Design a protein with these regions (language model features):
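Extreme N-terminal leader/anchor segments
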Residues: 1-79, 291-326
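Short coil/linker segments at helix-helix boundaries
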Residues: 47-78, 91-131, 135-164, 171-204, ...
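Extended, hydrophobic/aromatic-rich amphipathic alpha-helical segments that build helical scaffolds
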Residues: 83-93, 278
Length: 326
C-alpha cells in the first residue's frame, strides 16, 4: 500500500537583522577589527572614496566595532598621516564617550576632560580630511553629552560645516535632531521644526524627509519612558495614526520613495531609514504604503525602531503576513 505523505509546511519567514544590512565588505572589515587587523579597514575606506552616504554609514558601524579594541589607535600609530585613520579614531572616541555616559547612568555628568578630548580628536580629523563630512557628524553626535549643551553659535558652525560637505547627510541631521529633542537639549516642538525644515529642502529621492518619522519615534520613546509604571497615556494610541502623522508619512513616501530611480536596488545604507518609514506606515494603518516598503526591504530588518514598540521579529513578521507580503 502506498504511503501518503503529508504536505510539507512552508518554512516560516525569518527577518535578517544583519547589522551591516548585507554590506559584505563592511562585515569583513569589522571582523578584521575584532582580531586586531586594521589593513582591511584601510582598504575598505580607500575603496569607498567620496561616496559620502556609504562612507558615513560604514564609518559609523566601524567605529562601534573599534570602540572595544585598540585597532583604531594601532592604525593611526602606524599611518599617522592617513586621514581615514584620523577620522575613524575620532568616530571611535565618540562611541567610547557615549559608552561611558551609558555606564554612568542618565543624569550623571560625563567627564568634561574626556568630552573635550573627543572634540579635539574630531577637529583634528576635520583638518586631516577637509572634504569629509564624518568628523562633523561626530561633533554633532558628541555635542549632546555636554551638560547644558554647547553654545548655539558653535553648534550652528559645526552643522554648517557638515552641510558644506554633504548638505543632505541623513546621519548628521539625525544627530542634531536628537540634540534638539526633549530627551536632550530641546523640546518636541524644536525637534519637529528642525525635522520639517530639513525635509522641506531635500531633493526628490533623498531619504532626508524620513527625519519627521525619526522625530515621531523619538517622541514616542520619551513619552513611553516617562509613563513607565504610571499606566497608559491618554490619546497615546493615536500617536502613529492621527491626521498629521499620516499626512507626513505620505509626504515622506512621495518625496523619498517616489523620487528614487525606478527599479534601483535598495542599498545597505538605506535599510535603517527604510525600516523607520515602514514601521511608521504599518502603525499608521497605511496598507498600500506599508506593503510596498516591506516588499522593498525583503528580509532586511533593523532593530530600531521596531524594538521601541515590542519584540522586533514578531512585529516584522506579523505585519508582513497581515499585509500579504511575499
Amino acid at each position: 500500500m502506498a504511503v501518503r505523505r503529508r504536505p510539507s509546511r512552508p518554512s516560516r519567514f525569518t527577518p535578517d537583522f544583519d547589522p551591516d544590512f548585507g554590506d559584505r565588505a563592511l562585515t569583513d572589515a569589522r571582523h578584521d577589527i575584532v582580531i586586531g587587523r586594521w589593513q582591511g579597514v584601510r582598504d575598505l575606506l580607500r575603496a569607498t572614496g567620496d561616496d559620502w552616504v556609504r562612507r558615513t554609514h560604514r564609518l559609523r558601524l566601524l567605529s562601534h566595532a573599534a570602540a572595544g579594541s585598540s585597532t583604531a589607535e594601532a592604525w593611526w600609530a602606524a599611518e599617522p598621516h592617513n586621514p581615514d585613520a584620523a577620522v575613524l579614531r575620532a568616530a571611535t572616541e565618540v562611541v567610547r564617550v557615549f559608552d561611558t555616559a551609558i555606564a554612568a547612568g542618565r543624569g550623571s555628568p560625563v567627564n568634561r576632560a574626556q568630552l573635550d578630548a573627543t572634540v579635539e580628536a574630531c577637529l583634528f580629523a576635520a583638518d586631516a580630511a577637509p572634504a569629509d563630512p564624518m568628523p562633523w557628524v561626530s561633533l554633532l553626535s558628541v555635542a549632546r553629552l555636554y551638560e547644558g549643551g554647547v553654545p548655539r553659535r558653535e553648534l550652528r558652525g559645526w552643522f554648517d560645516e557638515l552641510r558644506r560637505r554633504d548638505p543632505y547627510n541623513t546621519e548628521g541631521h539625525t544627530q542634531l535632531l536628537r540634540y534638539w529633542s526633549a530627551r536632550w537639549h530641546g523640546t518636541h516642538g524644536a525637534m519637529y521644526d528642525f525635522a520639517r525644515d530639513a525635509a522641506g529642502v531635500a531633493p526628490p529621492g533623498s531619504p532626508l524627509p524620513v527625519l519627521v518619522q525619526v522625530a515621531r519615534v523619538e517622541e514616542y520613546r520619551y513619552i513611553a519612558d516617562g509613563a513607565l509604571g504610571r499606566g497608559p497615556v491618554r490619546g497615546f494610541d493615536q500617536h502613529w495614526k492621527h491626521e498629521l502623522a499620516v499626512t507626513e508619512l505620505r509626504r515622506t513616501h512621495e518625496r523619498w520613495i517616489g523620487g528614487r530611480e525606478p527599479g534601483r536596488p535598495v542599498s545597505p545604507e538605506e535599510i535603517a531609514d527604510l525600516n523607520c518609514l515602514a514601521h511608521a506606515a504599518c502603525y499608521a494603518g497605511q496598507i498600500e504604503v506599508a506593503r510596498e516598503l516591506l516588499g522593498m526591504l525583503g528580509a532586511r530588518a533593523s532593530w530600531v525602531p521596531w524594538a521601541y514598540t515590542g519584540e522586533p521579529e514578531e512585529q516584522f513578521v506579523r505585519f508582513r503576513e497581515g499585509l500579504g507580503v511575499v
